[in-house]
Every structure is written in structure tokens, then in C-alpha cells.
């Protein structure tokens, strides 16, 4: 991909303009979700061509509007310096790159946001507000465009590439692993453990005509020029994958990206992995690489039931093969087993790298505990939109 496209001129806001926008922060906090929900409705009606870049399930549940509202609020609070939210911004950049977001889509979002503010705030969204907001939005949009251009240059390929399904394996009663290889024979490079790939699914449903974008973690390193994803049946697309996808089917795949990557240069000798349910998928290559690096690995693995627990045999064998270097701690909710913070009391932040992924409530509980314990470099990500609740 070429150099970043310059669609917006970055013009620093004046102190007066910053104060004006920040004075509206309480309004954005209170009405932000209404604004963003209105924005998406307007945008999808006015610019239907962008629908295929958005997960419509996240629209229906309100997760995507909530995340965008949170993003706008945080941007307004940090107009002087984005450094405190740089991690959050980086997750957005990588998400956009994984989905193949293009610079030309930013003016569409900007115009739709302006219209939504006018509809929701009425006279409060006057000419002065619109002028200052457009300036601030343009600065943010071009910053993201520049950052995304830098990421695109590092990816293994541009755009989406057709992959063929080579194998389907049932890992649990509601989890299927999908093995895929490039149709054109492209040689896949080893992944960085923790990366995910984005898909564009046509699920052949007469009631759902839009292409459905989804991201799934790569659940093992590249073998035989194949990626593997492992998908739990919890939604429209995942139901299609588990029940209707067939060997030989073709699906477009974007190059891997990721925020929760294995830290291969860490000098710490121990790794603790906390995984809830299907959050185990990116942890598998992370665990394997940590063991190859000679680290002691502890897995705290929570599932609803034995029937819903994927990779049970794999982890059991891994424990046997590694002579005490890998310790598996299983927690099954149906058996009244639950990971407790007391199970993690021994974790010394100076000795352990810690990885965390699972349902939002699970992540919130253990993130709060681990950060309070002094784990300053906790490695985690979110399935779905970057969640402001965690």
C-alpha cells in the first residue's frame, strides 16, 4: 500500500476550541450512545456500501455504538494529548487494518456523525459546534489514516485473499476448528502468537444479504501452509461455520494483525494464562511458544461444562509431555468450580508475564485484581469491539 492518503489537513485546535469541546464532554457522555446509534442508522441508509465492514450483530446488541461513543468521549477528554489513550487508539488502528478499512471511508463517518449530532442535540449543534467538531474529527481521522498506512505496509498481503477450507474438526459440542489455505498457493509465514485474521462471510441466508465481517484468533501456528481458527457456535455467522461450512468452500481472509501478542523478548521465566471459554484460542500458540522458550507455563482454564471444553485432550497431553513445565488448572462452572483470586495470589509481577482473555465480566474481575497486584503489563484483548467496560 502506498503512503498515507491526505484527506484531512491536521490543524491544531486553539485553546479556545479545546475548551469549547471539552465543556461539552458531559453532554457527549450522557447522549453519546444516542448520537452514535443515530449515526450508524443514518450512515447505513445513506451509504449502504459501508455496511459490509460492520458486524450487524454488534449493531443490534448496541456494542458498536457504545464503543464509538466511548471513543468520542475519550478523544474529547484528551484533545491536548492522546498519549493516555494510545493503547486504545492502537487497538482501533489494528482493528481497522484487519477489516481493510480505507481512508475514503473516514469522510463518510465524519459527515454521518455531524448529521447525528444535529438530529440529537438540535440547536446545540450550531454552526460553531459543527465547525470545531469537523476540525477535531479531521485531525483524529488523519492521525488514524497515517497510523493505518504504517500498519498496512507491514502486513503479509493487501486486501482480502481467497482461502479454501481444507479440514473441519469438532473440538467440543459447540466448537469447530476450521483449517484454511490460500487458493493461490501463497506461502504463509509463521504467525506471531496471539494474532487474529479477518473474514468476509457470505452465509447464504435470504434474510441476511450483507457480507458479514468477523475476526477469529489463529489457534495454532502455521502448519502445512494452513491457518486454523476455532469457532464457538454463539451467533449467526458462527452457527453457519459450525453447521453449514464445508471442506472446499472459499472465504476471503485478511492478513493477520493483533494486539495481544506473545512477548518473545521478555526475560521473565514464568507465564500465567487466564482463559475463559473460547478465549483459549489465541492462547494455544502463546503457550506453545512460551514452552519452546523454556518458560514455566500455568494455564487457568474456565469452561461452562466438560462438553463445552475445547482442546481438553490437547492440554492433557501437553501437560504430560512437558515434565512439570506446563501446569493445567481446570475450572468447570457446572461442577461449581470457579477461578478465584486466591488461586492467583502467588503470581509475582516481577517473575510472570500474564495473558488474559474471556467474557467481559471475567476479564473485568481479573484485570482489576491483577493490575491492583502490580501487573502493569497485562496482556489482553477483546473479542468483538474494543470494550470500554474492561
Swiss-Prot record:
Residues that bind NADP(+): 277-282
GO cellular component: cytoplasm
UniProt GO BP: cellular response to nitrosative stress; nitric oxide catabolic process; response to toxic substance
Protein name: Flavohemoprotein
N-acetylserine modified-residue sites: 2
Cofactors (names): FAD; heme b
Site note Influences the redox potential of the prosthetic heme and FAD groups, residues: 95, 381
Reaction(s) this enzyme catalyzes, per UniProt: 2 nitric oxide + NADPH + 2 O2 = 2 nitrate + NADP(+) + H(+); 2 nitric oxide + NADH + 2 O2 = 2 nitrate + NAD(+) + H(+)
Family label: Belongs to the globin family. Two-domain flavohemoproteins subfamily.
Globin domain residues: 12-149
Primary location group: cytoplasm
Site label Involved in heme-bound ligand stabilization and O-O bond activation, positions: 40
Listed CDD domains: FHb_fungal-globin, flavohem_like_fad_nad_binding
Ranges where the record places region Reductase: 157-390
Compartments where found: Cytoplasm
EC number per UniProt: 1.14.12.17
UniProt note: domains: Consists of two distinct domains; a N-terminal heme-containing oxygen-binding domain and a C-terminal reductase domain with binding sites for FAD and NAD(P)H.
Binding-site residues for FAD, renumbered to this chain: 196, 214-217, 382-385
Amino acid at each position: 500500500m502506498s503512503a498515507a492518503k491526505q484527506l484531512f489537513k491536521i490543524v491544531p485546535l486553539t485553546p479556545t476550541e479545546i475548551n469549547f469541546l471539552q465543556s461539552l464532554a458531559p453532554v457527549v457522555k450522557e447522549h453519546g450512545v444516542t448520537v452514535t446509534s443515530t449515526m450508524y442508522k443514518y450512515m447505513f441508509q445513506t451509504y449502504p456500501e459501508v455496511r459490509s465492514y460492520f458486524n450487524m450483530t454488534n449493531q443490534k446488541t448496541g456494542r458498536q455504538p457504545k464503543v464509538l461513543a466511548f471513543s468520542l468521549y475519550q478523544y474529547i477528554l484528551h484533545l491536548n494529548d492522546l498519549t493516555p489513550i494510545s493503547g486504545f487508539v492502537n487497538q482501533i488502528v489494528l482493528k481497522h487494518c484487519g477489516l481493510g478499512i480505507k481512508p475514503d471511508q473516514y469522510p463518510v463517518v465524519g459527515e454521518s456523525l455531524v448529521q447525528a449530532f444535529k438530529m440529537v442535540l438540535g440547536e446545540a449543534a450550531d454552526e460553531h459546534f459543527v465547525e470545531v467538531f469537523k476540525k477535531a474529527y479531521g485531525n483524529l481521522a488523519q492521525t488514524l489514516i497515517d497510523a493505518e498506512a504504517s500498519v498496512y505496509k507491514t502486513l503479509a498481503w493487501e486486501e482480502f485473499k481467497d482461502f479454501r477450507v481444507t479440514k473441519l474438526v469438532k473440538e467440543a459440542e459447540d466448537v469447530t476448528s476450521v483449517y484454511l489455505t490460500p487458493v493461490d498457493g501463497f506461502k504463509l509465514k509463521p504467525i506471531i502468537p496471539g494474532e487474529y485474521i479477518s473474514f468476509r462471510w457470505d452465509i447464504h441466508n435470504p434474510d441476511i444479504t450483507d457480507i458479514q465481517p468477523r475476526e477469529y484468533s489463529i489457534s495454532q501456528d502455521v502448519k502445512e501452509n494452513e491457518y486454523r481458527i476455532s469457532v464457538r457456535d454463539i451467533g449467526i455467522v458462527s452457527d453457519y461455520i459450525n453447521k453449514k461450512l464445508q471442506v472446499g468452500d472459499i472465504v476471503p481472509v485478511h492478513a493477520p494483525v493483533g494486539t495481544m501478542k506473545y512477548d518473545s523478548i521478555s526475560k521473565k521465566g514464568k507465564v500465567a494464562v487466564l482463559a475463559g471459554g473460547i478465549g483459549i484460542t489465541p492462547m494455544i500458540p502463546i503457550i506453545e511458544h512460551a514452552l519452546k522458550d523454556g518458560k514455566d507455563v500455568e494455564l487457568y482454564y474456565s469452561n461452562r461444562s466438560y462438553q463445552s471444553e475445547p482442546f481438553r485432550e490437547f492440554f492433557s497431553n501437553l501437560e504430560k509431555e512437558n515434565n512439570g513445565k506446563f501446569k493445567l488448572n481446570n475450572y468447570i462452572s457446572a461442577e461449581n468450580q470457579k477461578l478465584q483470586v486466591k488461586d492467583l495470589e502467588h503470581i509475582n509481577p516481577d517473575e510472570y508475564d500474564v495473558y488474559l482473555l474471556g467474557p467481559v465480566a471475567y476479564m473485568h474481575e481479573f484485570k482489576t485484581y491483577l493490575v491492583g497486584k502490580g501487573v502493569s503489563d497485562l496482556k489482553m484483548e477483546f473479542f468483538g469491539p474494543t470494550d470500554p467496560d474492561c
